[in-house]
């Protein structure tokens, strides 16, 4: 016990000495930090209070010399960076070679050479900076750090709320992209499974879609409501998502004559459209009878589309246009039922049903397919033409499709419109016609007032 007591006393003395040394080191570090801060504040005040000469008041020759000195300064800074990076890259290359023996003399020479170059660049930077100090702020990284920190905290870049919002936006974007990708995979897998489980749906007998049947029902209903004695025609373009106002030709029995295109006329129509436009048209998927199932149409550098045909049950030599699907130039599709991933082409595909209904009821003695192809050719300036109504290219279409270029073309002269702008145009035309008719009735020279 007597031997252990002096040892304990020595240990306590050592611990106390270590604690005192640690406290002294902390005090010294704190004092050094305070001195550095005071020096930085003094330098910053000197920079603020330092008068800066106006460069534009100097002669042109002196201005040129000043610019050359700035170029020399930037050149020396780039040399320092390149020398340092080359020196460390040499270490990396030596490590990749996995050399067991290191040549110390060679490493010393490399280090000495790089240090000489760096010191030479620093000395030249000091010389040039002294020359241009009266025309610019003093170049020193320590000063810039304080200015940068004060600016960053004043602008709120490092605010926790801003960082939280940025993280939420990034997570939301990632979730949306993943959802879109997985939903597209799920839809393609579902379509493939349906083809395997229900092949009858995709056979030739089922090609006439429900849309063509609905058009036939609508045409039969309108024929019953019309009389055989009065036929009214209008020159105003039809409103969106409604059947055209111009009724088709009536037979003596009071029923509407169906308008079909013949398979024998397809080659002639394609040849005519190729002469009038730059569309590239190809027949796709020959049927057992030799007739095509549709057409593949491409407008160079703008879009491509699929035109799907339907065959009436009573007329096997004729066809109707059931559906038109628009796609981007670089989009791929492996089915006649595919749809585009771009909102603008989805919107034009929706508007194509209106075009099919209009031209099917108003062929004007020509081919329905030719009218449809001419309407498709009118979208060649899809991303360049302005809307006739708002005089803009992009316009808010809907929350689903967001901002789109003009996706609607009038059926008589192919004027580009946004759908909402076209509806406003129709309303203004109707209000103008009603106002003119009322003014004519109120006029003292009107025959109604005589």
UniProtKB/Swiss-Prot annotation:
Pfam families on file: Med27
Coiled-coil features, chain-numbered ranges: 15-118
GO molecular function, a single term: transcription coactivator activity
Keywords: Activator, Coiled coil, Nucleus, Transcription, Transcription regulation
Compartment(s): Nucleus
Any one GO biological process: regulation of transcription by RNA polymerase II
Primary site of residence: nucleus
Stated family: Belongs to the Mediator complex subunit 27 family.
UniProt function note: Component of the Mediator complex, a coactivator involved in the regulated transcription of nearly all RNA polymerase II-dependent genes. Mediator functions as a bridge to convey information from gene-specific regulatory proteins to the basal RNA polymerase II transcription machinery. Mediator is recruited to promoters by direct interactions with regulatory proteins and serves as a scaffold for the assembly of a functional preinitiation complex with RNA polymerase II and the general transcription factors.
Stated name of the protein: Putative mediator of RNA polymerase II transcription subunit 27
Organism: Dictyostelium discoideum
Gene this protein is translated from: med27
């Amino acid at each position: 016990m007597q031997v252990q007591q002096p040892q304990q006393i020595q240990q306590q003395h050592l611990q106390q000495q270590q604690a005192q040394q640690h406290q002294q080191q902390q005090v010294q570090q704190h004092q050094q930090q305070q001195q550095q801060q005071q020096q930085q504040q003094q330098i910053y005040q000197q920079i603020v209070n330092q008068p800066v000469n106006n460069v534009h008041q100097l002669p042109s020759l002196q201005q040129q010399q000043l610019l050359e000195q700035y170029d020399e300064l930037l050149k020396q800074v780039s040399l320092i960076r390149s020398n340092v990076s080359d020196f460390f890259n040499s270490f990396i290359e030596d490590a990749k070679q996995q050399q067991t023996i290191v040549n110390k003399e060679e490493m010393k020479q490399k280090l000495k050479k790089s240090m000489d170059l760096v010191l030479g660049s620093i000395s030249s930077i000091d010389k040039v900076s002294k020359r241009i100090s009266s025309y610019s702020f003093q170049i020193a990284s320590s000063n810039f750090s304080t200015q940068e920190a004060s600016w960053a905290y004043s602008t709120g870049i490092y605010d926790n709320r801003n960082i939280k919002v940025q993280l939420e936006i990034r997570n939301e974007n990632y979730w949306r992209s993943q959802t879109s990708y997985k939903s597209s995979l799920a839809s393609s897998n579902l379509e493939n499974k349906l083809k395997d489980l229900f092949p009858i749906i995709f056979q030739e007998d089922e090609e006439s879609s429900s849309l063509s049947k609905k058009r036939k029902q609508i045409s039969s209903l309108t024929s019953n409501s019309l009389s055989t004695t009065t036929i009214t025609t209008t020159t105003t373009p039809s409103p969106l998502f409604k059947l055209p106002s111009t009724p088709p030709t009536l037979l003596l029995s009071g029923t509407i004559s169906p308008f079909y295109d013949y398979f024998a006329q397809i080659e002639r129509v394609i040849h005519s459209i190729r002469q009038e436009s730059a569309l590239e048209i190809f027949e796709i998927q020959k049927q057992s009878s030799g007739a095509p199932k549709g057409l593949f149409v491409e407008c160079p550098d703008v879009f491509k589309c699929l035109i799907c045909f339907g065959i009436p049950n009573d007329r096997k030599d004729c066809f109707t246009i059931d559906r038109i699907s628009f796609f981007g130039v670089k989009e791929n599709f492996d089915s006649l039922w595919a749809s585009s991933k771009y909102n603008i082409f989805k919107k034009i595909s929706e508007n194509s049903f209106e075009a099919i209904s209009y031209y099917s009821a108003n062929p004007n003695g020509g081919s329905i397919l030719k009218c449809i192809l001419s309407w498709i050719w009118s979208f060649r300036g899809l991303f360049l033409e302005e809307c006739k109504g708002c005089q803009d290219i992009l316009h808010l279409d809907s929350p689903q499709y967001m901002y789109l270029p003009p996706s609607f073309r009038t059926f008589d002269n192919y004027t580009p419109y946004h759908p909402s702008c076209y509806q406003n145009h129709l309303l203004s035309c109707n209000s103008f016609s009603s106002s003119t008719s009322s003014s004519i009735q109120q006029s003292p020279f009107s025959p109604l007032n005589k």
